[in-house]
């Protein structure tokens, strides 16, 4: 079981790999498709299983993730299973999925203080553990 499922666009892979490394260094167990989906498996079914098994859903906001049909499916599956949503702004984007607008975002853009905001993300992952345990 993972602490957090990471939803992102493949075009943002360098940032997501760095973020995954930072989360792992902070004793978190992030789920990412490049390391958690075996070859020849039904990749979408594995993604859905990863979402269902995770405590939280981290959506990396960028123009590419916002435009991604797969990311939209992941968000909808997350909502269907009442998972905790954590929007993380990596790049400014328009037309963000409606459900993300109801949540307070974390900002890990290049202009932001990455280390300070990473600590906010870690705190957010640790907050409201009763809710996380229920779902």
Where are these regions (language model features)?
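Acidic, metal-coordinating catalytic cores used for nucleic-acid/nucleotide bond scission
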Residues: 9-11, 37-42, 63-70
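Conserved TIR/SEFIR loop-to-helix hotspot centered on a Trp-containing motif
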Residues: 63-83
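C-terminal interaction surface of TIR/SEFIR-family domains
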Residues: 1-26, 41, 45, 89-135
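Conserved RecA-like helicase motor-core motifs
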Residues: 27-37
């Amino acid at each position: 079981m993972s602490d957090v499922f990471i939803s992102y666009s493949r075009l943002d892979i360098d940032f997501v790999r760095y973020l995954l490394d930072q989360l792992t260094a902070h004793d978190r167990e992030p789920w990412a498709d490049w390391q958690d989906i075996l070859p020849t498996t039904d990749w979408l079914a594995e993604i859905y299983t990863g979402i269902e098994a995770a405590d939280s859903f981290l959506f990396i906001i960028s123009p590419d993730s916002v435009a991604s049909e797969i990311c939209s499916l992941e968000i909808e599956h997350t909502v269907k299973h009442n998972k905790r949503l954590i929007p993380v702004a990596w790049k400014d984007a328009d037309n963000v999925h409606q459900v993300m607008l109801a949540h307070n975002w974390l900002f890990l853009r290049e202009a932001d203080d990455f280390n300070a905001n990473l600590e906010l993300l870690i705190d957010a992952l640790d907050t409201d553990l009763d809710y996380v345990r229920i779902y």
